[in-house]
Every structure is written in structure tokens, then in C-alpha cells.
Amino acid sequence: MSGRALPGALALCLAGLLAPAPALAHHGSAVVGMAGPEGPGAALETTSPIPLPRGALFLMVKSEWVPYRQFDWADPENKTYSLFDTLVAGYGFAPWLSAYVFLPYNVKAQDGAGTNVGFGDPGVLVSLAFKYDEGFRLVPAKESLDELQDWHFSVFGLLTVPMGPTIAATPALEWYAPDMQTGFGSPSFQLGLSAAKQLDDDLTWLADASFQYFLPHTYPFTRYQFGFETRVNTALAWRVVATPGFRLDLAGEVNFLNLVPDREADGGGSLQPLPASGGTILYGGLGVRAYAGRFSAALAARTSFARWLNDQAAQQGSEGLEVARVALTLSWVLPQ
């Protein structure tokens, strides 16, 4: 497609549209995103494939509050809430190659066990961006507004490094269960693909799919492996206000999450699936994102509207049984 070249400042504002989200099981997820007054919109949980410009530095902080539904059968050990905070730094190494570092900090509260607070496992994510314009090709250094309406894609990979604590204990000096620890104890790997298409001047469609694999970890009290995760997300971002220095978007999303049951060592040391874990969940969410110059702020809420858990009556505090997931995100782009 042809059209006038995208101004440098606008290209920079579009930098943060890339949003490969490390879907950290039981530990929240981080999504980065910005946009300019013109061009494609960014979703809230769904990855966008638009990369960072070469030499651009991206900074983001996200805080996600997750209160859980309380059940009489889980008393006195109901999990009450989790707070997932994430600091993100990204850099554009090439017009088509971006990398991000994620540093999580988690708070997990449970009746009768107190609150466990600590850093999670940091992650490194690399994304390769390409587009379709009379054939597939890497994203060029400059794109016009017309060219930004082409199909855009990215392939991304994530590695988490086991640096978060895994041996925290309750005030009664009992070990927290693996899903109440703030770290995983072993590396995890995620691969994903994202796509975006600007449908008109104000409406952008986005989608992504990813798979995450967790290696087992030996704790002082057990050997445990978190279940594999498959995520498929889709979103519409609608630009409702656009001025030279300000933009306001509304976004609606549907998120699919499939969790393979966690596994724990039996008496003989073999890892066996845990019946009270895993399942399939559908989330729906709405949010608003505002942009002012190089800064962006977003507020979003989502909740599960359908769930098929493997043993729901014993899965209090798991995905799908949240009251809601409410996230606040602040981000900033520094030019080269």
C-alpha cells in the first residue's frame, strides 16, 4: 500500500503497540501497549504485533488486583486476593526486532496462612515482526498511515528465569503451597503468534495465540510441575477521541485459557496429575486507554463468563473463580 510517510514522533508513539504478554500461570500477566493519534489501536490483554522503532526505549509498570470468590467449603483456607505488579523495559534493536525484560513482584493472601510477598521470576521476551503487503516481509523502518492498515504479525518467544522465592513459609512456619509461592523454581518457555488489522480509521482488530511450558521443580516439601497453558485472545480497539496531543481508546476483549492439570510427585516420586487443578476458562473484559504524548495509561477489568474446571468444588483461588481481574497500566516511550 502507498501513502504519506508516518511522522517520526507519531511512529515513536506507535512503538508500544507491541504487546507479547508473558502469561505467567498463577502470577498474572503483563501486556505493554501504546498508540499515536492516528494508526492502529492497542488492546489491553491481547498482544499487538506492531514493533518498537529501532533505538526506542519502552518502560511500563502494571498492577493487577485479583480478589477470589470465597466458599464455605474452603474455610478457613480461602485464598483472598493476589496482587501482581510488573515492571517492563523494552528496546527496539531493529525495525522488526524488539526485546523486553519483565520483573514481577507478587502479593498473595490466604486466610489462615497470612500474606506471601516477593519477587516473581523475571522473563526475557523477543519478538520478530512482519507484515503482508503483496507478500510477507519484515516490517520496514518507516510505514505510512496507509501501510499501517496492512496485515501485521509477530512471532514471539519468552523465557522465564527461576529467581523468585520458592521456600517461603507461613507465620506458623509451614511451607506455602507451590501456587502460593511467588516464584516457579524452574524455567518456563512460551511461544506465540499475534496478528492485527486496522479495519477503518478508528477500529482495530487484534488476536494472539500462545503456549507456555513449565519445567518441574523440587521443593523441600514436594516435587511439582505447573500445568501447560494455551491462550487465545481477540480484541477490538475503538478510537473515540483523537487530537494532535491526546488519544482515547475503548477496548473489548475475549480471552480463552486452557490449563493442563498441575502434577505432583506421588509416594514413588512419579509426577501425577492433580484432580483439583486445570480446566478451560473464557474471560470477557472492557477497558479504556488514554495517550498523552509519549505517556499512556490504561484501566481494564475482566471476569470469567464461562468455565469448565476439572474439579470446581475444590479449586477455590484458581483461574476462573476470581471475582474480577482489575489492571492499571502506565507506560512511557523514550526516543532514540
Model regions and ranges:
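Surface-exposed strand-loop-strand hairpins of Gram-negative outer-membrane beta-barrel proteins
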Residues: 29-35, 53, 64-85, 171-180
